[in-house]
Design a protein with these regions (language model features):
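Conserved catalytic-core segment of nucleotide-activated headgroup transferases in glycan assembly
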Residues: 53-58, 189, 193, 207-211, ...
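Conserved acidic donor-binding segment of nucleotide-sugar-dependent glycosyltransferases
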Residues: 355-361, 370-375
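Non-catalytic membrane-proximal stalk/linker segments that position and tether the catalytic domains
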Residues: 1-47, 53, 86, 93
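Short hydrophobic beta-strand element within catalytic cores of glycosyltransferases
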Residues: 326-330, 336-340
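Acidic donor-binding loop of glycosyltransferase active sites
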Residues: 122-123, 192, 305-322, 333-335
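A short, well-ordered alpha-helix in the C-terminal region of glycosyltransferases
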Residues: 377-391, 403
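Membrane-proximal helix-turn-helix segments that form the acceptor-binding/catalytic region
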Residues: 157, 172-194
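C-terminal alpha-helical cap of glycosyltransferases
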Residues: 394-407
Length: 407
């Protein structure tokens, strides 16, 4: 046995000892089942105010609860690291959240044990992300051969990694992309339902997996916020804003590209323009970009106040896949933005395409300068946001989610 395995074993022993001391007992009767029961497994307890995938999954959970579906949530965390500030938040919503406990014999009830115990009563297992489906689908199906297996792609990982390879020419990325393609296609074969997050991902998947009737589209949920008296006009706004978690490589690349290539061109025209970068899990290489005009604000719990004083949102994403929550979030608040084709994927910008979308460094800089200084174009872009978001309404998504559960 390796030293790492021994350390993990010892930490698990200490956890079990602590649970015994505190009398944290597992009782199946503490969990609420109903006529329809859904098991959701993700890498983490969704951090809905930190990343787009977590926000989307949280909204799906809320829709399930609204429709009287019992939800059981499991995170693929190590037993001795099974901690999250978000566990209680989901419990407060009415979600059955797995947490380590001990059985009547004093044995640790692991997440795998929990899955085996509840799955005979589960109707649908919603496995979120490729590695989660690959890891847990067999365990779930063995515990209940009749369970409906849902593979939620979140985004087409193969496409995201391949695009990154095409940008950086790193052979390791190409190998990683090919690895994920095998995982994702195997998952598609084993799933009863495959969820793509955008029409683009769905069409790209067709090139590799032709069982189209299995694949459904469930995108992000974005509700446009109607302008009120508190909505700040063009004249009362300043600065650029980028939002994104730095656990996600496309965000790190976009911020470096913005600072090192795009903004020097913008600053020639608008020397005092400030850029605010909001996002959790900031790394050392991102910290090194900070300056008086390029502010790293870290994690901000409530973005509303920042968004309502910002003049322009920027997202110069050079690779990625799926729907970008940051784009929808900007549109929700009628905040004009400048992004790339990758950033805009899944959204129909219509007549605003030529105003808000650019794919070269010079064009990105030009569009930022134009929208930051041109009130007429800014107002038109702001007023177009509601129409762009229409396909992402809660009513549309609710119908799609309920179809997956009941059909």
């Amino acid at each position: 046995m390796s030293l790492k395995s021994l350390k993990n074993q010892f930490k698990t022993y200490l956890l079990t000892k602590k649970l015994k001391k505190n009398n944290i007992l597992f009782n199946l009767n503490d969990f609420k089942f109903s006529d329809k029961n859904v098991l959701i497994i993700d890498e983490i307890i969704p951090e809905f105010n930190k990343d787009s995938g977590s926000r989307r999954l949280t909204e799906i959970i809320k829709l399930l609860l609204k429709n009287k579906v019992s939800v059981f949530l499991v995170a693929d965390l190590k037993q001795y690291k099974y901690k999250s500030d978000y566990i209680q938040k989901f419990k407060d919503l009415g979600v059955n959240v797995y947490q380590p406990s001990i059985d009547q014999k004093g044995q640790l009830v692991t997440k795998e044990d929990f899955i085996k115990l509840i799955t005979p009563k589960i109707d649908v297992a919603w496995l979120h992300r490729p590695t989660i489906f690959s890891k847990f689908q067999s365990l779930v199906k063995t515990a209940n051969p009749n369970v409906k297996l849902v593979f939620d792609m979140v985004d087409f990982h193969y496409v995201r990694l391949l695009r990154e390879y095409e940008l950086n020419k790193d052979e390791a990325l190409k190998a990683e992309a090919e690895k994920f393609l095998k995982i994702e296609l195997e998952n598609c074969k084993n799933a009863d339902v495959v969820i793509a997050i955008s029409t683009t991902d769905k069409e790209l998947l067709k090139q590799h997996f032709n069982t189209d009737e299995k694949v459904v589209l469930i995108s992000n949920i974005h509700q446009h916020i109607d302008k009120s008296d508190n909505f700040n006009s063009f004249e009362n706004r300043n600065d650029l804003l980028f939002v994104g978690s730095f656990r996600h490589d496309p965000n790190s690349d976009a911020v470096k590209y913005l600072k090192e290539d795009v903004m020097p061109l913008v600053w020639k025209d608008i020397p005092d323009l400030k850029v605010n970068i909001i996002g959790s899990y900031i790394t050392e290489d991102i910290e090194a970009l900070a300056s008086d005009k390029f502010k790293l604000l870290g994690f901000v719990d409530d973005l509303n106040a920042v968004i309502n004083t910002t003049k322009l949102f920027v997202a110069p994403l050079r690779f990625g896949a799926g729907i970008k929550g940051k784009i929808g979030q900007s549109l929700e608040h009628s905040l004009p933005l400048v992004t790339t084709n990758v950033g805009a994927e899944g959204f129909d910008f219509g007549e605003q395409t030529n105003v808000m979308i650019a794919n070269t460094t010079n064009d990105l800089a030009d569009k930022i300068i134009n929208l930051y200084t041109n009130k007429a174009d800014w107002d038109l872009a702001s007023n177009s946001c509601k129409a762009i978001l229409k396909p992402f309404s809660i009513n549309t998504t609710e119908a799609q989610v309920i179809d997956v559960i009941y059909k």
